[in-house]
Amino acid sequence: MASEGTSWGAEDIGAQGDQVQHSEEQVDNYAHDSLASGDADAADNGTEDDGGEYDPESVTIGTPAMVPEPASSGTQRQTSKPKMSGGFIVEASDDEDEDEDEDEDEDEDEQPASAVPQTDAVSTQNHPGPSTTSDEHVPAAPTHAPVPPAVPSNVTPVLPGFGPVDLLEFRVKEDPRGDMDAWQELIASHRDFSPLEKARSTYNRFVEIFPQAADKWVEWIELELKYNNFVEVEQLFGRCLMQVPNVKLWTVYLDYIRRRNDLNNDPSGQARRTVTQSYEFVIDNIGVDRDSGNIWQQYVQFVKNGPGQIDGTDWQDRQKMDQLRGIYRRAVAVPMSTVNNLWKEYDQFEMGLNKMTGRKFIQERSPVYMSAKSANIALDNITRHLDRTNLPRLPPAPGFNGDQEFRDQVEMWKKWIAWEKEDPLVLKSDEPKAYNQRVLHVYKQALMALRFWPEIWVDAAEWCFQNDIRENDKEMGTELLVEGIKANRESVLLALKHADHIEVNYPDKEVDKAEFAQAVRKPYDDVLETLYEMGDKVKEREKLEISTLKQAAAQDPVQTSIEENDDDEDNTPKRSPTEERILAIQKGYAAETQLLSRTISYVWIALARAMRRIQGKGSQAEGGLRKVFTDARQKGRLTSDVYVAVALLESVVYKDPVGAKIFERGARLFPNDEMFMIEYLKYLHSKDDTTNARVVFETCINRLVSNPDTLAKAKLLYAYFHKYESQYGELSQISKLEDRMAELFPEDPKLKSFVDRFSTEKFDPIATPIIISKTAQMRPKQIVPVVQHQHQQSISLRNSPMPVRQEQNPRPQYVRATASPKRPLAVDDEELNPPKRLARGASPLKGAAGRRLDQQRRNQASALHRDITFLLNILPSSQSYDAQRFNSAALVSILRDTEIPDFATLKAAGGGQPRFGNPTHTRQPSGEFVNRPLSPYGRMSAAAGGYRNSPLRPETGNAYQSNPYPPPEASGQQPTWPQAPGGYGAPAPGQFGGYRY
């Protein structure tokens, strides 16, 4: 092992820097496998017998059979060839230099011939010819294939022959599931301007990809009905009717049945019986839909127009009444928009026959109707913003346009499904079949809109498994999984769920394990095949886009400046705009390829674990874990995760030393993958092989540090090894390691390495503070945030001189004068000398309201909202206000301490007169004060002044004398009499700035 680690520096350079074993790693596979019998075997002397019969180094990886070898004639490029990018034609170039450029790019990519054919024929796969494409490669009606089939390289489109329809054909072939707009335009064009056979072919291709698109089925059926093609119409109904629970489609079916069965010329009654059976068939399948109200009403009207009288006594009449009663009783139990009208009709129907029995029937069905009515209101609220479309679209990628709107629609569908599962109509216990029908129906409605959302397929299948839902003796859950996989061939979730269901419920597991393993493996193989096709498609798109960009750059060259720029300190060569765009394209496709490779790798890991459970370790030929690992290496496009998972399975489950060889193999394939190296180090440490672990660490670190591009990857390796040395190593080794880390990563805090010695994922004894004094260290934070600018501004306002108080205007002062005869309090009277409260009667809040208020006072005050605290903080100090301030506490005290007698006492005292009486003043006030109440200080007699006799002063009763002085505000003039001495007769000054309360 130690010597093996030292040999990594001499390994192939092509393997370095690659962390994905796809087409590039296949070159390494061939190189390393060719060395397996030479250098690798020589390095493994003494350990060859440990592997037993299985040696991963001896696996022969042949050329994948799925990719054909390119024909020699296909390597010759055409001098003028149109290019396609995103469904649009890019003008071809006659320059021959692009051939050499693309050949150089292909050599740089190091693509083996077995993985990607070194020919430009792949670039024509995205842009097939108009009609010269052979049926062998491009089928006329692809079945739910997300990736268009390959096009022969000898097919060269001719530019003059292209039209709008041809461009639409290219768009739908390039993106069959995503370009819904192109599909609709293409269908409309063929329907309106092409022969019927062409329109049929287009419709057929569309419904194979979107089999639940009810609107397109209706268009196709109406097109056939336009030409009276009844045989084709019935065939279409047989294909779509049971698969598409759409009200519009089933309504078209009813119209067709009524059209084909003439009720006016029906002496035998066979036509009416056929229509009746059709209505029952439709009601049984689509009658639970909340939009099926019109079908119910049409059925009722159809029965009413039939033979017989509703109030008759003949057997036919009674049969008609029983039929109508049955329809009504079923219809009023369905939550739909017409349930209220149907209930009114049912009420009139029953009461018109017999009021006694009618009331009985109405009372029996009334609870069901009320439940349906309330459920309809609830459904209106749930589905108010729901888009019940049957033309599904691919879900937008997270963070892109339409992502949030699509997820909102998904949540609405989930809310509707959850509402149906809660059983608001109370059907689960009494009518379980009706309950299952309703839930399954809403699942089917959701699948019509969310066809490309795998989660909804799995959710529906899981519910069917739990409730044992079957249709036509078929397990509905399995059918949903199969249909979901057809709609989403690349979905790993659906493939894993289907394989898991097969593994759990396979009938004869012990009889034939090979057949059992093949049944479980089929979903894995299908999704892997789709993912590999998508990976090839990504590579082809990348080459096509780069070649198109080079053609455009060659046709429009940009002259670069040759002047020296003094601002450029370094002498690094500048890239042209074309090179920058090519680099950006390569980075984008590299990220997409990496994502596909990781997905493929984890599917292989899941398959390896499943086969190990079924067939055990197995062998390279018979099956099991090792067979899966061999197949995965042959297919390629693997990440290091596959090697880690298989090596750990061999080591942990079977205690086989082959796991170490797999790790060694992965270390040569992924020398710059820091995560793989960490797993390798963990494995060696688990085996107490510290010597080889240190060799592996040093070898990988030296390789990563030598390249500035991979220097950042070394930090994770250093962190892991430093943690291991901190726990089990010597202090000298720890110090040396920390010095090396500080030298390589000077931007990291030096204290961090020291702290990492003693911390774990659960606890950090150094960073966690120790509380010494709760008083000093655990003070609660202030609720009101301090804003520095406003705080300084308020301080400056408080320190600045206050403005001079202005004199009060006499007229507003009179308006603000209080009508209370009680003496106003001074400014600080309440604060210094609180008023004595007189004993009062029982408070009206002694009951529950009082207890609630008392509880609120006892509870701790809640923190104010952030915006409120900010507003309170920026308000100026109260000292900056110049206007008179309102003392709310004094007003509340007056209202609280004032005792108001009852009306009898008030009337006996002479009060109760209206306040708006004729004044006794000799002159009328100005027009502004004509309709205001009289001033309590005006000249009026004791008998005429109701307010003067008010018992607000019970100590004197009605013995008050009139005020001998009119207020100066009443006359609008300055007083001519001398000011009365201070005392009871003089009016008191305003409580706050002259205001009276």
Swiss-Prot record:
HAT repeats lie at residues 194-226, 228-259, 270-305, 319-352, 389-422, 434-466, 654-686. It is found in: Nucleus; Cytoplasm. Residues 46-56, 92-111 have a biased composition (Acidic residues). Pfam families: Suf. GO terms for cellular component: cytoplasm; nucleus. The keyword Nucleus applies. Component of the cleavage factor IA (CFIA) complex, which is involved in the endonucleolytic cleavage during polyadenylation-dependent pre-mRNA 3'-end formation. PANTHER family: CLEAVAGE STIMULATION FACTOR SUBUNIT 3 (PTHR19980:SF0), RNA CLEAVAGE STIMULATION FACTOR (PTHR19980). This is mRNA 3'-end-processing protein RNA14. It comes from Gibberella zeae (strain ATCC MYA-4620 / CBS 123657 / FGSC 9075 / NRRL 31084 / PH-1) (Wheat head blight fungus).
